[in-house]
Swiss-Prot record:
InterPro entries: Exonuc_VII_S, Exonuc_VII_ssu_sf. Its main location: cytoplasm. GO terms for molecular function: exodeoxyribonuclease VII activity. This is Exodeoxyribonuclease 7 small subunit. One of its GO terms (biological process) is DNA catabolic process.
């Protein structure tokens, strides 16, 4: 896939959604747009997963020093 940046893929995904929601595409064009949207969504999800793995929280200990810990989402 030629897309290198999350922001670029997200913009393309938004454009696809807008075209699909317009109701002006033929069935064939709608299917092509849908396929493109699925690819962009998968790319964005992959990039977000990669970013989440890199995020760390810097926590202050009682003695005043800091410790890095992996970021974890709380279960709802």
């Amino acid at each position: 896939m030629a897309v290198e940046k999350f922001e670029t893929a997200l913009k393309k995904l938004e454009d696809v959604v807008n075209r699909l929601e317009s109701g002006e595409l033929s069935l064939d064009d709608s299917l092509k747009a849908f396929e493109e949207g699925v690819k962009m969504a998968a790319f964005c999800t992959k990039k977000l997963d990669e970013a989440e793995k890199k995020v760390e929280i810097l926590l202050k200990k009682k003695d005043g020093s800091f410790a890095k810990e992996p970021f974890r989402l709380e279960d709802d």
